[in-house]
């Protein structure tokens, strides 16, 4: 059995840190129609988490679409028992088991797709990856769920119907965000153009793409003609222009003052 998988380790997921990498695994599951997105958690935590901290780490991943866990631990040792033997761990296991089971019964609900610029990163322009991180942090901070899509997904998996992109989970995207990138593969760009023609919303957020590429970046490229009626936001901030390019939110969580929490 093959599952989209990520590891959750202390430098990456901990209270007061921001890292949305679980979205890589869950997006693959959603786009390709896999019921589970797997995480091996707690493998390299040199400071043993408390139960509230462990629950935070699980919740952080579940919110981002992870719905299957393996807790990495050693059941015994020569010196002392591991932290997973502490009181209350049984309850945390039961909570994780129940929550992830419920998640597996439903269908993913994100209506926004974020293009991941693999082709551009291959050329050594790694700044675009940092721009993507900034953009998705802005989305999550403003409670906008999303999935990553790639050139391969656009070419092989996503289908068009009435201005919506459907994946193999029968989930559909109404808006596609194209963050900073230089290249987009030709067939993928043609799918994006057709999505726009059918009424889908496209937001170019950051630096706009310049070229399509085929099998070569040297002699198989063509200039991209950007649509006039798409949405454009050069700043890596969540602006009203960004909001206008996105579907209406179905659920918004607010604090006691009626404001979206930071």
Segments from the language model and where they lie:
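Carbohydrate-binding surfaces of carbohydrate-active enzymes
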Residues: 1-262
């Amino acid at each position: 059995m093959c599952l989209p998988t990520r590891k959750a380790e202390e430098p990456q997921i901990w209270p007061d840190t921001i890292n949305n990498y679980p979205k890589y695994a869950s997006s693959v599951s959603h786009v390709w129609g896999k019921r589970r997105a797997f995480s091996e958690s707690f493998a390299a935590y040199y400071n043993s988490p408390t139960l509230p901290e462990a629950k935070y780490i699980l919740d952080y991943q579940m919110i981002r679409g992870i719905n299957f866990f393996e807790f990495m631990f050693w059941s015994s040792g020569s010196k002392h028992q591991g932290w997973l033997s502490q009181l209350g761990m049984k309850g945390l296991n039961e909570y994780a088991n129940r929550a992830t089971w419920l998640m597996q019964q439903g269908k993913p609900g994100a209506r926004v797709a974020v293009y991941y610029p693999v082709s551009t990163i291959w050329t050594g322009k790694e700044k675009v990856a940092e721009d993507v991180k900034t953009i998705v942090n802005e989305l999550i901070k403003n409670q906008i769920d999303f999935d990553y899509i790639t050139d391969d997904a656009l070419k092989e998996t996503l289908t068009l119907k009435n201005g919506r992109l459907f994946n193999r989970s029968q989930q559909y995207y109404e808006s596609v965000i194209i963050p900073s990138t230089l290249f987009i593969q030709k067939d993928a760009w043609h799918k994006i153009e057709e999505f726009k023609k059918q009424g889908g919303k496209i937001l170019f957020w950051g630096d706009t793409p310049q070229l399509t590429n085929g099998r070569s970046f040297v002699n198989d490229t063509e200039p991209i003609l950007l649509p006039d009626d798409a949405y454009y936001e050069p700043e890596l901030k969540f602006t009203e222009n960004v909001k206008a390019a996105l579907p209406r939110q179905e659920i918004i969580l607010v604090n006691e003052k009626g404001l979206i929490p930071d």
